[in-house]
């Protein structure tokens, strides 16, 4: 045994003791656990969360070890914390085990959380002793065994395991002593007897049992003792008999203890075996920490610390004590007092969970001890307040609260905005109305009696006004598409945009708005528009415009969100269920932003009829009569709502406005309801409690519940019961300060079904914003009598008028939205107030940029008007917030207005002014912003000392400057910061070194700042000293080298030149004018800045001399305030040394941007021009700014559209630019001397924005963002028109027929039902005749291509996204028939193999899209003598059973495999040599090796997309038209084949790959296909999983440069075992691909045959509009099938291509036809898109018209059919604008 650690510890002035009681804390246990759960979500409480998780997992494991009878006592366990509220479980059979676990969990969660908040307190535990009573001793064991806070999770879980096992074991043993009735109230196993001594009590018991025959195990005994009381324990019946029958005990004051779990502290019942059973090794994870690491634990039986070897034995000792030893707390108190008396301590800190009698006894004893200790009582519960912290980061996304940051709606009653919706609610409006005519004709579809078929019994509903209103061009839809697209989708798009706009969303602005991390989730339960409106005339957009998945998909596509998009249908709860799914995605971390909502637009009369028939609907003229006694069903309603949700911490980081916070959400199902459509109160209550637990919310803290409240008797009463049970129970009543209000929006807006939950959620958010609960208008007679009359007792209220719902600082408002669906789903969501926000300081900028933009001028005018109205209503709005909201938090469109302003009044005035000019605004081209030129100012433009506000306000600019200053000081130069930061007066003169470095470095920093806010230069120019900054920004020199050159040059100037000896003078004249006016006086030109701007330099005397005649001539002369005369002879003394320094110390690189050189008067692009000599010359020679600009303009480097930004302290170069290039529209300064930086910058930024430069507004505002607020400005003003397909007539009443079903039976019945031969491609023999004497036969088979294996084989070879029968399918058919015929005629031998020869495919066999219809082919095999071969013919069969012209022919010849291999052996070494050569070329980098994935990806992108089974090539080597491949055949088998097509293709389609993927063929313009081959033979079977090599070389023919031939060799283990000889390929223009390979039932083709005849195809991209006369057509009809593109060497004569020749011979249209064709094409486009011809301006893009891929196909097909212009849909990608297409048409037909 080891010694206890108290003997070895170093004593301190303060001793610590942790006391773990056997009683629960006085605080409400549910509330305690709720707080623990809430705090476990925070990042600082990871150990707390881990303990709760470990404890939960531990009890789950223990429950699994129980008998099934006991397991059934437990409900599914989410968290051990939930046991606190399970009263049934706590009062049941295992109450001892349950309460033991809960006590430990309560103590451990409190302790761990306390230590995580106060980590230093772990040191107190390390030196403390531990005391406890009962199960509390197990908590002490856990703490004793832990060395760190993290250890407490594992040791605490073991304490939980021990307590549970102990409780279960005690239950089992106690049941053997006295079996209790589980249905009766639990009875106690212990009484405390007061005012008696242990001796007296024991004497009484001894006397009582002296002559008793009771078994010892049934006797009452003393289980705990103290000086003045004892606790007696025993079986309940025996114990009750004792205290009522014994006079001694009856007359003593006794109290029944809450001990219901069984007997403990009973040495006569338990022994070591019982201890061992509890401590069994199964799943016990206590780490055996040595005794030296343990804290001392005081034994309650001996009064001394346990003497143990390790932590496990400590647990075992405590278990033994709890089972077999009586409690003697007095001895513990005495020992602690005695121990402390031996120390030097003057103070004892007792950590505990609240006052208790044992703890008070200990405190009293310590205080009265001789040591007179000061006792400090430290309550561990103190850290856990009643309100959870609001500003602490969550532990991970699962623990995050969620913030709703944007919302928008379209609802009945004219509620087309959030504000109008609130107005409807506030005024208590019932929005029901007669069904409007745009939905359907009520007169013909209404029958109140319900006797007429398919008619509705109600004529009322709640409807959105004009649901067809939509801005189609804004959302890139054509009018035709917009009209077809379901208005649910359209309004989802619109409300999503508005919600995102309210949220201040800009793509990729922050981490949470990355496009890849945004998903959409929308609820939709009906497809009315598709079923009725669209269904009247099914068109191109029927599927993408009507199928539900396209709703959220369209939102993702429009906004380019790359996250998930879900359409969710849970009936009436779809909307809120979609929001809940979005929340779960945010909690899981799947997305960072969710756009979610619900949609419902009613147009189908069947919905009304069906719901009336199911008794769902009210017949009256009212919205839902929610909670009314006469409620008779609900009123159907429209509704569309969208919300934007983020995690709360992201929303706060993003500076979003938070409308409300989601604490929890969940969905379950009413599985026990009486019917699927009937709600269930129990399941709704279960869900509510579950979500409340997860959210950590006390139900009594909920102050408002928005109920589903449909106005049905069943739904309302069930829902109300669930709400009352959870939120307003009678068992635990609400206080007067906790009123609960309930409401239901359906009383106003009707039941919008799949949008109902979204509507309710928006209502609650508006209530939070407005601090008012709107009146409930559903009760018009009296309240539903089923609800009872105890609302007052429950403190529950229904508001019948506007009721205040104020926010208070000390208490958050919590609301619940409850929603359920007719399919049985229930969804609940808990919300609370947004956290309060405060602004610490205001924006230091005085001038700001406010912008407005739109896609149309109409919208822009309306946007301006809306902002003016907003300012009128909010005159106190801060201009900084308007700027922030309109710039950084709004999408920017092509029509733009920008205003630089400093006050609201000025802004409003400017808005009026700009409104009048909108007519003249031109749209910017976002894809082509104007080029930007940076001009860098030279010396002398600024004050001697600057005070840059940009340096003061912007950390990034300041950091740029500091980095440059650090480089400056590192090179030994003086810091230049003092010349920029305002620390000196503006006229303070600095040294030349500081002045020049300050100028260049501030310009570098300024250029980088412009770049950081999105303004990047395309070209640069520097004036004099500014050229160094320009060179750095262009990438010629590094910043360090720029500083080196400028600093050393300035030093040399100081050392070699005298300040003031020379001057520079600006003259407002040209050099010629100066020459004429100089009167012969000499002068030096330093700078030629413009046509009339020249700077002279010279000695002081020279300048004075020249100045006089110049001024006399009327020329303006200004002396420049510079220390030295640059570009003059004054600099001569330093030139040699300066050049040497530059040559040895600086690296000059190739410019990354063009540099306009004022020295050379030209633009520099190369790496050699700027060097050491250049900077020498630039110091001495003249600056010719004029010549430089002229040269740049001449070569096109700059132009009139170039935007100039001057980088420097004052605009100088801008004037030079304007005078030299008058066409320049914008030349803008960065700073202006004497003007605040932000004023100048704002003015320039505003102008840059209006010409199309994309400003990074987020970066511009970043330094000030926390002081800015996103305003809820008016939404974008859409330019809406009505797009609506009206339901016509009454066909919904009369629909139904069986015509198509009967037709299908006829067609399906054409094939016989049985067949002697049946494979996947040879399915039915319809005729066969054999003559064994002559060897003749005829066999006719038919196969349906729609048979799954056949169809899969075709779709395994996809071209133009269609399944195409590869030639290898025809090969398999041929092999199958050959083997069948030879076997039938008795001529099939062991080594017999078959040669499929002379295959010619004249038409492609393309699979139908509609697989419901059969697609039958017939193959006829015939021969007069099988030894001479068999002829095969392929034909299509139509629905009537008639055969079409043959589309393929072939012949079959038998051969001997060994003969073939022998004949090929002479070629083997040649083929192997070519393969080795190809491998060598790869090693030399002259050939390409492609991997499996790369090869097939390339193949798919160029022509054929193969299924996995076809993808046998593992690697490919390609060199021109020659190649080889390593092949491994698939082992995945399906179907019945003779030679599987995917085996043939795998070994042979190398030829097709070469022809379509080699760089020898232009795959962008052409594709290559094969009509067949000469022979195809395999000497060995093709085996699954076997490996082969293929080799081919394709050779163009001499006769036809579009025809190629080759031989494909197949090798196995170096031996040729197969040959596809004479495979043929022809090259076609890619524009023909769609024409040749489209499904026969495709709607965009006029050819409806089963195969695609390409005999009329052409190589010309645009065939003529005039038809060829019949006489010109060729008789031959050779056509080429897509199939297996293989190919090979060995030229032979090309097959005839008369069809191609015929088309090539067509005449081009004459020039006079071109304009006609162009005009007709434009009209066709206008008709298809649904716009006026006048709208098709040249600069209009097809994407702007809504021409997507589908519309492209439609227009292309219309061109083919009407104009005979054969194009495909990619035409509108190649020619993006109307003008581009118009030019192409004109050029083609000119």
UniProtKB/Swiss-Prot annotation:
Domain of life: Eukaryota
Phenotype on disruption: Impairs the production of cladofulvin. Does not affect virulence.
Compositional bias ranges of the Polar residues kind: 1654-1664
Domain Ketosynthase family 3 (KS3) stretches: 399-833
Region N-terminal acylcarrier protein transacylase domain (SAT), annotated ranges: 27-265
Protein name as annotated: Atrochrysone carboxylic acid synthase
Domain notes per entry: Multidomain protein; including a starter unit:ACP transacylase (SAT) that selects the starter unit; a ketosynthase (KS) that catalyzes repeated decarboxylative condensation to elongate the polyketide backbone; a malonyl-CoA:ACP transacylase (MAT) that selects and transfers the extender unit malonyl-CoA; a product template (PT) domain that controls the immediate cyclization regioselectivity of the reactive polyketide backbone; and an acyl-carrier protein (ACP) that serves as the tether of the growing and completed polyketide via its phosphopantetheinyl arm.
Region annotated N-terminal hotdog fold, chain positions: 1323-1475
Segments of this protein annotated with the region Malonyl-CoA:ACP transacylase (MAT) domain: 934-1254
Gene name, Swiss-Prot/TrEMBL: claG
Region spans: Disordered: 1644-1667
Keywords: Multifunctional enzyme, Phosphopantetheine, Phosphoprotein, Transferase
Function: Non-reducing polyketide synthase; part of the gene cluster that mediates the biosynthesis of the bianthraquinone cladofulvin, a conidial pigment not required for virulence but that plays a role in fitness and resistance to environmental stresses including UV light and low-temperature stress. The pathway begins with the synthesis of atrochrysone thioester by the polyketide synthase (PKS) claG. The atrochrysone carboxyl ACP thioesterase claF then breaks the thioester bond and releases the atrochrysone carboxylic acid from claG.
Factors inducing expression: Expression is positively regulated by the transcriptional regulator wor1. Exhibits high expression at the early stages of infection when runner hyphae were growing on the tomato leaf surface. Expression drops after penetration when the fungus is colonizing the apoplastic space between mesophyll cells. The expression is induced at later stages of infection when conidiophores emerge from the plant and produce conidia.
SUPFAM superfamilies (alphabetical): ACP-like, FabD/lysophospholipase-like, Probable ACP-binding domain of malonyl-CoA ACP transacylase, Thiolase-like
Pathway: Pigment biosynthesis
Record-listed E.C. numbers: 2.3.1.-
Domain PKS/mFAS DH: 1323-1634
InterPro entries referenced in this protein's UniProt entry, alphabetically: Ac_transferase_dom_sf, ACP-like_sf, Acyl_transferase_dom, Acyl_Trfase/lysoPLipase, Ketoacyl_synth_AS, Ketoacyl_synth_C, Ketoacyl_synth_N, Malonyl_transacylase_ACP-bd
Gene3D superfamilies: 3.30.70.3290, 3.40.47.10, ACP-like, Malonyl-Coenzyme A Acyl Carrier Protein, domain 2, Polyketide synthase dehydratase
Active site residues of this protein: 572, 708, 751, 1357, 1545
Region feature (C-terminal hotdog fold): 1487-1634
GO biological process: one example: fatty acid biosynthetic process
A GO MF term: phosphopantetheine binding
SMART domains documented for this protein: PKS_AT, PKS_KS, PKS_PP
Reactions this protein catalyses: holo-[ACP] + 8 malonyl-CoA + 8 H(+) = atrochrysone carboxyl-[ACP] + 8 CO2 + 8 CoA + 2 H2O
